Swiss-Prot record:
This is Chlorotoxin-like peptide MeuClTx. Expressed by the venom gland. InterPro entries: Scorpion_toxin-like_sf, Scorpion_toxinS_Cl_inh. One of its GO terms (cellular component) is extracellular region. Inhibits Kv1.2/KCNA2 potassium channels. On glioma cells, may interact with chloride channels (probably Clc-3/CLCN3) and MMP2 at the surface of glioma cells. This complex may be then internalized via caveolae, thus inhibiting the chloride channels necessary for cell shrinkage and tumor propagation. The modification Arginine amide is found at R38. Residues 1-3 form the signal peptide. Keywords: Amidation, Disulfide bond, Ion channel impairing toxin, Knottin, Potassium channel impairing toxin, Secreted, Signal, Toxin, Voltage-gated potassium channel impairing toxin. Disulfide bonds join C5-C22, C8-C29, C19-C34, C23-C36.
Length: 39
């Protein structure tokens, strides 16, 4: 399963970066979830 970080908020313009950082550089927002891609 994919690890999940904090929820992604569309009002936060830095959210994509926060999600990537939380996932160790490989993650993206999908809806309101931050999904980590295990690479």
């Amino acid at each position: 399963t994919e690890a999940m970080c904090m929820p992604c908020f569309t009002t936060d313009h830095n959210m994509a970066k926060k999600c990537r950082d939380c996932c160790g550089g490989n993650g993206k927002c999908f809806g309101y979830q931050c999904l980590c891609n295990r690479g």
